[in-house]
Curated annotation (Swiss-Prot):
GTP binds at residues 345-352, 391-395, 445-448. CDD domains: IF2_eIF5B, IF2_mtIF2_II, mtIF2_IVc. It comes from Azotobacter vinelandii (strain DJ / ATCC BAA-1303). Residues 114-138, 170-210 have a biased composition (Basic and acidic residues). This is Translation initiation factor IF-2.
């Protein structure tokens, strides 16, 4: 017999050890620890206790059979002994309590019958007494009425006496009340007698138990739960079963579904109180396959919930953002601030050179390729006040960077070369300025060149709704030369005049607020962000929040690298201390609590991730049917690292636009800073090319590149990287086969040759006819045969080529149906490399 401990028994019955010990103590067992042994008898005792505590009555045996064995030995002849076993069996039958119960029932019936007879006798006497009283009262009233009628004189004149008024209804109800009570008593007595009679004739519990188990009734049928009647003497006793009853709703239940900007399928199903499988099935019917953890955007979830008949409540999940906005108070006296001026225009029109002359520096010569690839932010002290300049790139790839420049600025200086006129990026800069509602000052540059034509610039800009002041418009035109310095003072005066009209003000005493112009990852200092302070004052040590990033300002530097303690409105600074490089264009805000900044940053990260996933999935679903049945595109994978965030965005946008329906570019990884070992591993895993834009690879990355033979390329001009990617994509396209027609000959006569069959006597009309080249036979300009030129002769001599204007004999391989007037076209197939 195997013995088990209390702990093992608890594992078997799936209950905590403490609870099992408590139940054993209640059962009278002496176990106190989990390591004590439990015998089979103790298990039976515990089981009997648990059954009794849960209302299960253990039925006592009505019949007990005892067996007794005795063995004796008998000696027989031959000194042999025989074992004799005597078995005795005795059965004890317990007397059934039914007879005692029946006797008790008879006594109770006789007692109840006597009580009922007494009640009926008493009720009858009470009814007779009340009837006698009512009869006497009625006779007295009739006598009184007759006496009154005899005294009236009208009776002698034959006037009919007035009828006796009927007793009021209330009195009638009073007289009827005793009779009604008596009837109710008699009815109750009869009901009790009938119930006892039915109870005596009911089957016993044992006979009824199987039928009761077979019948299942719901809560709605008897109102008290599931049960069956039982008990001694047929008494009605209702035993409830611990079973839940559910009543189906008579109509669809309409619920209010709260939907944020994104919601998963499981959360939406839970709010609608339906299974997630039903939601997935419904989405399949709508033509959108989803999974249970799929993130749905707000519009899709709203459409789905409304289709299923529920009310939709759209909520904005910006409670933290609103709370943050309320906590920011910009109190104080507003003061005039310096204007923020953005210099925009087409590439190579002289934007940076113009700023160089104003700042008396040489920035343009230091730019790679002589073009600006970052947003430069500078503030300049002039005789008439301070001006902050933002220099934006002019290349087509930097559209987003120019848009950010227009968004953060007060005035736009549109630089147009007098010798070049309005170009595509010039038009784009005009559109950005108008979209941001920013006034434009046009600087017509390179006015000192001989081929300069400023009037053409005016006409081109006027055609694009930029009207000069002298023509009745509101745009100032200034002729300047960035090299000679002509018109620079007039340009600054025009800018400051425009700033006075705008009445630019800020509150220096308020907490700092600005916009991120640029960001990069410095190897020695970490994430560095170029920030333009727009309002308030930014101080060293402030806790700042920029998009999904936050941190404490550890240091501030101006554009010359000099440290600053604080920066007021319209001052561009570089700040150190953020946890990562923020995106250019993010709004930077000073907050009071670092905990609140971290909470808002994490909330924005989660929100951005969910929205991005929802958009990616919707884009995949939109393209699923378009790409069905098409060959898979060839993809050029690129890992791209750049020095600043703006250049990274510009390159990603420019590279993603390259390609066609056969090849495409996919930037599998991108970031700011040098090329690290993890970037090299990513390129190795994804079979990608490593591109470094103004950055270099560290020692670990170079080691992996050399060992694995990865393709690592460095660039410092955006034109070069785009051209190289175009060449790589063109190589992935492969080559195509083209046909070049070498010559055309017309059949003038047909000869028969025993060796070659039909020989066509031809005149070469165009080009040259070559032997052993593919040909086509055309009749009425319709191709009737394609084959190979087998024999080419001139004056019975085999030749390899016949030029135009000469006669020749042509034998076509496996073709004899040549007729006069046919044309024989000789061609060749060449493979040509394709390009984008």
């Amino acid at each position: 017999m195997t013995q088990v401990t209390v702990k093992e028994l608890a594992l078997v019955v799936d209950t905590p050890v403490e609870r099992l010990l408590q139940q054993m103590r209640e059962a009278g067992l002496s176990h106190t620890s989990a390591e004590q042994v439990v015998t089979d008898n103790e298990k039976q005792a515990l089981l009997a206790h648990l059954k009794g505590s849960h209302g299960v009555k253990l039925e006592e045996p009505r019949k007990i059979t005892l067996q007794r064995k005795t063995t004796t030995t008998l000696r027989v002849a031959g000194s042999k002994t025989i074992s004799v076993e005597v078995r005795k069996k005795k059965t004890y039958v317990k007397r059934s309590p039914d007879e005692l119960e029946a006797e008790k029932q008879r006594e109770l019936e006789e007692q109840r019958a006597a009580e009922e007879a007494a009640v009926r006798q008493k009720a009858g006497e009470e009814a007779r007494r009340r009837a006698a009283e009512q009869e006497a009262q009625r006779q007295a009233e009739a006598a009184a009425a007759a006496a009154v009628a005899a005294k009236e004189p009208e009776s002698a004149l034959g006037v009919a006496p007035e009828p006796v008024a009927a007793p009021p209804a209330s009195e009638e109800r009073k007289r009827e009340e005793p009779r009604r009570v008596d009837k109710e008593k008699v009815r109750n007595v009869d009901d009790e007698r009938r119930e006892r009679k039915n109870a005596q004739h009911r089957p016993s519990i044992k006979d009824k138990a199987p039928a009761a188990r077979a019948v299942v009734r719901s809560v709605d049928e008897d109102g008290e739960g599931f049960g069956r009647r039982g008990g001694r003497g047929g008494k009605s006793k209702l035993k409830k079963r611990n079973q839940h009853g559910f009543q189906n709703p008579t109509g669809p239940v309409v619920r209010e579904v709260t939907i944020g900007e994104t919601i998963t399928v499981a959360e939406l199903a839970q709010q609608m109180s339906v299974k997630a499988a039903e939601v997935i099935k419904f989405m399949f019917k709508m033509g959108t396959p989803v999974t249970i953890n799929q993130v749905l955007d707000q519009e899709t979830a709203q459409l789905l919930a409304e289709e299923l008949g529920h009310k939709v409540k759209l909520v904005s999940e910006n409670a933290l953002e609103e709370q943050l906005a309320e906590s920011l108070k910009f109190e104080g006296e507003a003061e005039a601030r310096a204007p923020v001026v953005t210099v925009m225009g087409h590439v190579d029109h002289g934007k940076t050179s113009l700023l160089d002359y104003i700042r008396r520096t040489k920035v343009a010569t230091g730019e790679a390729g002589g073009i600006t690839q970052h947003i430069g932010a500078y503030h300049v002290e002039t005789d008439r006040g301070m001006i902050t300049f933002l220099d934006t790139p002019g290349h087509a790839a930097f559209t987003a960077m120019r848009a950010r420049g227009a968004k953060a600025t007060d005035i736009v200086i549109l630089v147009v070369a007098a010798d070049d006129g309005v170009m595509p990026q010039t038009e784009e800069a005009i559109q950005h300025a108008k979209a941001a509602g920013v006034p434009i000052v046009v600087a017509v540059n390179k006015i000192d060149k001989p081929e300069a034509d400023p009037d053409r610039v005016k006409n081109d800009l006027a055609a694009r709704d930029v009207i000069p002041e002298e023509w009745g418009g509101d745009t100032q035109f200034v002729h300047v030369s960035a090299k000679a310095g002509t018109g620079i003072d007039e340009l600054l005066e025009a800018v400051l005049l425009q700033a006075e009209v705008l009445e630019l003000k800020a509150t220096p005493s308020a907490p700092g607020r600005g916009v991120v112009i640029e960001s990069r990852l410095d190897k020695g200092r970490g994430p560095v962000a170029t920030v333009l302070v727009q309002n308030g004052t930014l101080r060293q040590g402030d806790v700042v929040l920029a998009g999904v990033n936050f941190g404490r300002v550890r240091a501030m530097l101006d554009e010359n690298g000099q440290p600053l303690k604080e920066a007021g409105p319209s001052i561009p600074v570089e700040i150190l201390g953020l946890d990562s490089t923020p995106d250019a264009g993010d709004e930077l805000t000073v907050v009071t609590d670092e905990k609140k900044a971290r909470e808002v940053a994490l909330f924005r990260q989660g929100k951005f991730r969910e929205v991005k996933l929802a958009r990616q999935h919707s884009a995949k679903l939109e393209n699923i049917f378009e790409t069905m049945g098409q060959d898979e595109k060839k993809t050029l994978n690129i890992v791209l690292k750049a020095d600043v965030r703006g250049s990274l965005e510009a390159l990603q946008g420019a590279l993603s636009e390259l390609g066609n329906e056969e090849v495409q570019v996919r930037v599998v990884g991108g970031g700011v800073g040098g090329i690290t070992e993890s970037d090299a591993n990513l390129a190795l895993a994804s079979n990608a090319v490593l591109f470094g834009f103004n950055v270099r690879a560290d020692a670990g990355a170079r080691k992996i590149v050399e060992q694995e033979g990865l393709d690592l390329r460095y660039y410092n001009v955006i034109y070069d990287i785009i051209e190289d990617v175009k060449k790589a994509l063109s190589g992935m396209l492969g080559s195509e086969v083209r046909e070049n027609i070498l010559g055309v000959a017309e059949v003038r006569d047909v000869f028969r040759s025993p060796k070659f069959g039909a020989i066509a006597g031809c005149m070469v009309l165009e080009g040259n006819v070559h032997r052993n080249r593919p040909i086509r036979v055309l009749r009425d300009d319709v191709v009737i045969f394609e084959g190979e030129l087998e024999s080419l002769r001139r004056f019975k001599d085999d030749v390899s080529e016949v030029r135009a204007g000469m006669e020749c004999g042509i034998g076509v391989k496996s073709y004899n149906d040549v007729k006069v007037g046919d044309k024989i076209e000789v061609y060749e197939k060449v493979q040509v490399a394709r390009s984008l």
